[in-house]
C-alpha cells in the first residue's frame, strides 16, 4: 500500500506474562449510540466506557450528520447524546468501513424528513447491504440504489409491519432493522428466510440492549423477531471491555507458554465470552475466571483443533493464527465461516494467502479453513485494511522472527492503542527468537 510503512512484529522466545485492561466493546458502543439517539424524544442519554476508535467515531459523526448531539462528558469514553433527528438538506453519511454504520443507520434515516446519502470507503462498496435495503423498501421506504452509494428518502415515518429478509450474509441486517423498529408506526416483525444467521450472539446482544431501553421484543420463535411499537427509553449505558479485542492478547499467552490476565472481564455478558474461553481451552490453555478478571495460561506446544466459528466469525483471524503456529504437523479445521468472504476483506482468502506466504499450509474449504502447522519464516503479512488481519499477524509474529505487518494502523478501526498495548505487554521480553518455528 503506497505511503504505508511496515511494522516489525515483535517475537519472543520466553513466556509472556502480562495484565491488561481492554477498551470498550465496539458492538455495545455503537448499539448504545443508536439507541441513545432514538431515545432523544424521551431525554438525554449518557454512555460510560465507550470505545473511541474509527468505527465508533464514524458512528458518532454519522449521528451528528443526522442531527443528533453527541459530545464528550468529561472524558473521551464518556458520552452524552441529545438533540434530535433532523438531518440538513443534502446530508451525507460516511460509513467508512464500519458495517454497523452502514446497516444500523439507514432505518434511522428513513424516519427523517430529508433525503440522506450513504457512502463509504471503496472496500465498503463490496460489503453486503442489498437485503437490508430491500427490506426497508418492502416496508415502504423509498431508496435509490441497492449498494453504496445509495440514498434513503425519508418521509417522516415508517409504517412497519412484517418483512422477510435473508440475513445469512450478516446478522447486522436483523440488528439494524430491530434497533429502529420500535419507532415504526406498527412496530416490526422480521422473518429470516435464508440459511442460518451468522454471529447470532450479536443479534442476542441487540435484543438484550433493546429490552434494557424498555423496548418489548419477542424472539421466542426461531428466525423471527417482533419489536413492539413504543418509545425507546433514555438511560445510562455502561460499556463492557471488548472481549473480541482481548483475544489476540490472550493468544499471546497461549503461543508463548505464558499467562495473560484481562481485567474487568464480565461475569455475564452478551458478548461471546463463553465461546472465547472454550476455543482457548481447545488449544490446551488453562482458563481461569474470577469476578474481576480472566486469565489464560498457555503451553507453547499444542495440537490442532476443530472448531465451529459460525457464531463468532470475528475471532477467525486470531484462531487461524493460533492454528498456524501450533506444533508442526498439527491439523486444525475452522468451520462455519463462509460469511467471512463478505467482511472487511475476504478473510478466508486473505488468511490463506498470508499463512502460505510465510511458509505455512492453509487451504480454503466451502465454509472455512484447514490449517496444517508448519515452521514459518519471516516476511510481510498484509492487513488488507482489516483490523483483525493485522492483529492475527502480530500473533504469528510472536513465534516467527522477521514478520512485518503492513498497515498496522488499520487496527484503529476498533483498537487504536493496539501497537502500544502489544509493546507494553511484551515489555522486558527478548525481541528475537532464534528457535522460532522449531
Swiss-Prot record:
Annotated 3-phosphoshikimate binding sites: 26-27, 31, 170-172, 199, 314, 343
Coiled coil location: none
Pathway stated in the Swiss-Prot or TrEMBL entry: Metabolic intermediate biosynthesis; chorismate biosynthesis; chorismate from D-erythrose 4-phosphate and phosphoenolpyruvate: step 6/7
GO biological process, alphabetically ordered: amino acid biosynthetic process; aromatic amino acid family biosynthetic process; chorismate biosynthetic process
Its EC number(s): 2.5.1.19
Keywords assigned by UniProt, alphabetized: Amino-acid biosynthesis, Aromatic amino acid biosynthesis, Cytoplasm, Transferase
Catalytic activity, as annotated: 3-phosphoshikimate + phosphoenolpyruvate = 5-O-(1-carboxyvinyl)-3-phosphoshikimate + phosphate
Residues the record marks as active site: 314
Entry binding sites for phosphoenolpyruvate: 26, 99, 127, 172, 347, 388, 413
A Pfam family hit: EPSP_synthase
First-level EC class: transferase
Main location: cytoplasm
GO molecular function (one): 3-phosphoshikimate 1-carboxyvinyltransferase activity
Subunit structure of this chain's protein: Monomer.
Family statement drawn from the similarity comment of this UniProt entry: Belongs to the EPSP synthase family.
HAMAP family listed in its UniProt record: EPSP_synth
UniProt-recorded name of the protein: 3-phosphoshikimate 1-carboxyvinyltransferase
Gene from which the chain derives: aroA
Amino acid at each position: 500500500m503506497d505511503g504505508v510503512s511496515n511494522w516489525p512484529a515483535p517475537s519472543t522466545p520466553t513466556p509472556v506474562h502480562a495484565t491488561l485492561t481492554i477498551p470498550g466493546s465496539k458492538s455495545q458502543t455503537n448499539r448504545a449510540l443508536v439507541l441513545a439517539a432514538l431515545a432523544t424524544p424521551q431525554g438525554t442519554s449518557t454512555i460510560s466506557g465507550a470505545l473511541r476508535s474509527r468505527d465508533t467515531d464514524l458512528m458518532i459523526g454519522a449521528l451528528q450528520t443526522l442531527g443528533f448531539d453527541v459530545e464528550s462528558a468529561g472524558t473521551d469514553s464518556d458520552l452524552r447524546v441529545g438533540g434530535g433527528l433532523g438531518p440538513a438538506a443534502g446530508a451525507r453519511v460516511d460509513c467508512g468501513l464500519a458495517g454497523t454504520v452502514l446497516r444500523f443507520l439507514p432505518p434511522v434515516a428513513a424516519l427523517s424528513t430529508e433525503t440522506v446519502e450513504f457512502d463509504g470507503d471503496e472496500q465498503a462498496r463490496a460489503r453486503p447491504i442489498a437485503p437490508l435495503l430491500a427490506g426497508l423498501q418492502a416496508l415502504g421506504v423509498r431508496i435509490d440504489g441497492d449498494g453504496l452509494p445509495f440514498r434513503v428518502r425519508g418521509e417522516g415515518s415508517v409504517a412497519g409491519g412484517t418483512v422477510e429478509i435473508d440475513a445469512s450474509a450478516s446478522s447486522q441486517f436483523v440488528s439494524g432493522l430491530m434497533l429502529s423498529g420500535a419507532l415504526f408506526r406498527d412496530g416490526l416483525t422480521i422473518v429470516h428466510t435464508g440459511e442460518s444467521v451468522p454471529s447470532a450472539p450479536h443479534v442476542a446482544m441487540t435484543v438484550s440492549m433493546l429490552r434494557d431501553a424498555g423496548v418489548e421484543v419477542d424472539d421466542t420463535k426461531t428466525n423471527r423477531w417482533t419489536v413492539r411499537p413504543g418509545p425507546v427509553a433514555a438511560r445510562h449505558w455502561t460499556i463492557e471491555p471488548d472481549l473480541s479485542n482481548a483475544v489476540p492478547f490472550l493468544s499471546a499467552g497461549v503461543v508463548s507458554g505464558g499467562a495473560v490476565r484481562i481485567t474487568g472481564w464480565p461475569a455475564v455478558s452478551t458478548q461471546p465470552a463463553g465461546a472465547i474461553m472454550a476455543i482457548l481451552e481447545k488449544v490446551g490453555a488453562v482458563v481461569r475466571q474470577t469476578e474481576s478478571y480472566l486469565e489464560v495460561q498457555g503451553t507453547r506446544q499444542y495440537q490442532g483443533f476443530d472448531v465451529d466459528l459460525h457464531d463468532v466469525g470475528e475471532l477467525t483471524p486470531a484462531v487461524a493464527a493460533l492454528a498456524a503456529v501450533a506444533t508442526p504437523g498439527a491439523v486444525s479445521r475452522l468451520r462455519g465461516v463462509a460469511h467471512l468472504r463478505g467482511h472487511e476483506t475476504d478473510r478466508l482468502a486473505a488468511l490463506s494467502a498470508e499463512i502460505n506466504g510465510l511458509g505455512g499450509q492453509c487451504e480454503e474449504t466451502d465454509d472455512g479453513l484447514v490449517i496444517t502447522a508448519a515452521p514459518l519464516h519471516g516476511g510481510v503479512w498484509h492487513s488488507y485494511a482489516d483490523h483483525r488481519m493485522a492483529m492475527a499477524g502480530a500473533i504469528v509474529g510472536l513465534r516467527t522472527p522477521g514478520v512485518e505487518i503492513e498497515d498496522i494502523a488499520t487496527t484503529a478501526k476498533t483498537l487504536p492503542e493496539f501497537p502500544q498495548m502489544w509493546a507494553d505487554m511484551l515489555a522486558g521480553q527478548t525481541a528475537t527468537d532464534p528457535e522460532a518455528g522449531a
